[in-house]
Design a protein with these regions (language model features):
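Sec-dependent signal peptide recognition
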Residues: 1-8
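N-terminal signal peptide c-region/cleavage motif recognized by signal peptidases
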Residues: 13-15
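Disulfide-bonded cysteine motifs in exported proteins
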Residues: 18-19, 102-103, 138
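N-proximal, solvent-exposed amphipathic alpha-helical segments enriched in charged/polar residues
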Residues: 20-63, 75-77
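Sequence contexts marking disulfide-bonded cysteines in secreted/extracellular proteins
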Residues: 23-25, 107-109, 142
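Mature extracytoplasmic domains of secretory-pathway proteins
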Residues: 59-109, 113
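A mature extracytoplasmic/lumenal domain signature
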Residues: 72-76, 127-131, 142
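Short, exposed beta-strand-loop hairpins at the edges of beta-sheets
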Residues: 114-137
């Protein structure tokens, strides 16, 4: 249940496409994705915060039209994470790339989330440090 919830949370973020007059129903099923994003936001919000792994917490979720935005908090300050990454012989750039892949995998591995994206929606993952500094803003627009 928890794994399904996490995967669903990470999958249902969408971005408004420029030029679409009725993005709310601009999909092959004429399904109202605004309402679906809002419904999912409420379901997920009731289960937050949720610690996903050491140093990472799913802290909040919001929806904007056909977009579901997932806010993840890195439970360190930037300098602490940089030191940890450097000690592992990696760079912040390589970490960012890994997180992009993991976000896309998470968004596309859940059937409901993948369907949401395939209807033309976008999942958004915003990663911030515990002091509020933003680290990454990742969009998953296709699976």
């Amino acid at each position: 249940m928890r794994a399904t919830t996490i995967a669903l949370m990470m999958t249902l973020t969408t971005k408004v496409s420029a030029g679409s007059e009725d993005i709310c129903r601009a999909n092959s099923l004429a399904h109202n994705v605004y309402k679906e994003a809002n419904r999912l936001e409420k379901v997920l919000a009731s289960q937050l915060p949720l610690k996903l792994e050491e140093g990472l917490e799913f802290t909040s979720v919001s929806s904007d039209k056909n977009q579901l935005i997932t806010y993840m908090t890195i439970l360190y300050e930037r300098f602490v994470l940089e030191d940890k990454i450097r000690d592992d012989g990696r760079s912040m750039k390589s970490l960012a790339h890994t997180m992009e892949i993991m976000s896309a995998d998470s968004a596309c591995s859940n059937e409901a989330s993948r369907a949401f994206i395939q209807l033309g929606n976008v999942r958004q993952f915003i990663y911030i440090f515990r002091d509020g500094e933003q680290f990454l803003d990742i969009l998953v627009e296709r699976c």
